[in-house]
């Protein structure tokens, strides 16, 4: 590399993934890849193969495709949001980092824009440094770790390796907590304050937590910090976990059960925030916003509202870009002194 060339740096913003279409075949392809990852399902491979292929994939894609169709526009909501996040973070970082030839790329763990394909493209263009920002605020072996696995598989195939930074998570970053609190206040300024604010996170099986996955504890820290930022009393908010799958115990309390209990106790108004999601997707727009509203109201509850994810809010873009910028500043210092 000549001294006149700018160091080439690629930033990867990675989310979970989404089907290509809201159709049964597309959903089946996506679910097969997702649910075949041993990071996601920790069941002996042969036993899980039978369950997946005989009891899950023949039935679940039809129900899921119908759910996807209810939230689909011209594309998957998650993919549209991740594209916009990528473009806006790129504009921010280009403005602040003239010293680098800098590119920001979207990636998904599963489905199209897969992390493996993104890394393969980098092989043709040697990089000075690669920064991976998983868009999972709270680390889990079920979500963030598969991205580490992708890099571990890619690294032995490369001769001229780049420097590599992986931003593990940001569950208690002050800008993250502030952005969440501001999103709640902005929503309540328009729609009023409820009796209860529920912070509902995607769940994981309890045995995963027992074996050392820090996810649930990090979710609890996020929720507590948001509640403190909002000056909420203990009886004005709660944390719960949604989307349990199968018959084993998952981390508790369960979102659906808590909402029904509240309704039976006479709680009439609830707003739900899901700080585990950096982009709205099927789970937030259909399960949280629609299914759980029906559960709450059928059990006797009244007003129910889902507060959107941070998505492409300016405070969120500032957070994501800021996380990367801190590493670019360190890289600038390193390159200047080597």
Swiss-Prot record:
One of its GO terms (molecular function) is ferrochelatase activity. It catalyses: heme b + 2 H(+) = protoporphyrin IX + Fe(2+). One of its GO terms (cellular component) is cytoplasm. Pathway: Porphyrin-containing compound metabolism; protoheme biosynthesis; protoheme from protoporphyrin-IX: step 1/1. It is an enzyme of class 4 (lyase). Keywords: Cytoplasm, Heme biosynthesis, Iron, Lyase, Metal-binding, Porphyrin biosynthesis. Catalyzes the ferrous insertion into protoporphyrin IX. Belongs to the ferrochelatase family. HAMAP family: Ferrochelatase. This is Ferrochelatase. It comes from Acinetobacter baumannii (strain SDF). The gene is hemH.
């Amino acid at each position: 590399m000549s001294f006149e060339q700018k160091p080439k740096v690629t930033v990867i913003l990675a989310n979970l993934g989404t089907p290509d279409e809201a159709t049964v075949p597309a959903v089946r392809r996506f679910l097969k890849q997702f649910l075949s990852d041993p990071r996601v399902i920790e069941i002996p491979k042969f036993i899980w193969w039978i369950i997946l292929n005989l009891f899950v994939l023949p039935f679940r894609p039809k129900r899921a495709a119908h759910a996807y169709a209810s939230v689909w526009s011209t594309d998957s909501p998650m993919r549209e949001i991740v594209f916009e996040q990528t473009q806006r973070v790129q504009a921010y970082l280009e403005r602040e980092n003239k010293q680098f030839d800098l590119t920001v790329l979207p990636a998904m763990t599963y489905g199209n824009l897969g992390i493996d394909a993104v890394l393969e493209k980098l092989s043709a263009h040697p990089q000075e440094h690669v920064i991976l920002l998983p868009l999972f605020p709270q680390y889990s072996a079920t979500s963030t770790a598969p991205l580490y696995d992708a890099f571990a598989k890619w690294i032995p195939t490369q001769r001229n390796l780049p420097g590599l930074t992986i931003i593990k998570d940001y569950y208690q970053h002050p800008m993250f907590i502030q952005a969440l609190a501001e999103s709640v206040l902005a929503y309540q300024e328009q729609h009023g304050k409820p009796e209860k604010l529920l912070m509902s996170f995607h769940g994981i099986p309890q045995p995963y937590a027992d074996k050392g996955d820090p996810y649930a504890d990090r979710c609890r820290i996020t929720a507590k910090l948001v509640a403190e930022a909002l000056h909420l009393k203990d009886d004005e908010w709660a944390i719960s976990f949604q989307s349990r799958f199968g018959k084993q115990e998952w981390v508790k309390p369960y979102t659906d059960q808590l909402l029904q209990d509240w309704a039976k106790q006479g709680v009439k108004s609830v707003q739900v925030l899901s700080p585990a999601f950096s982009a709205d997707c099927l789970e937030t727009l259909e399960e949280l916003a629609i299914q759980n509203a029906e559960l709450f109201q059928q059990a006797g509850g009244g007003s129910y509202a889902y507060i959107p994810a941070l998505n492409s809010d300016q405070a969120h873009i500032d957070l994501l870009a800021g996380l990367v910028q801190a590493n670019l500043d360190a890289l600038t210092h390193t390159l200047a002194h080597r």
